[in-house]
Amino acid sequence: ANAQTTDALGTYTPYSLFGLGDIDKQGTSFNRGMGGIGIGVRDNRHINYLNPASITERDTLSFMLDFGINQKNFYNTDGNVESGYNTANMQDLIFTVPIYRKSAFIVGVTPFSNIGYKFRESETRTDIISKYGNISYEKYGTGSISQLFLGAAMNVTPNLAVGAQMIYY
């Protein structure tokens, strides 16, 4: 049997049934495009929430906004059964604003993990089918954990910036 579906699942994998779910890769699309690097990047054109001190490297007269969308295609096979899902999620919403000279404030929300699974099985025992009719069992789960963060940073010297960030899950 083949199926291709789009649903409101943040992810589609049977492994998300366990624990916190499918842990998201952290960082903006810029960080992901660089292989997930975050600590060593300090750039005036991109927001890097993985390194709070990096937000001081920006124009002191303007704010910055980053909004990302993530789309995935999942294809699962198990013996003769194949299924596919398409998912699209918000990846991040981050805002930075200058405070004073080379200091800045950052606030944002990003996903931490996603849960999304859907299992369906039909009853095959003839005694149960003859007594109750066709029966289909379904397990469905969805959810996510997001992280909200606030941070601030300032330049101590021209080559040294200090930043701190608080994260709420």
Model-derived features: positions:
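Subset of outer-membrane beta-barrel
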Residues: 4-169
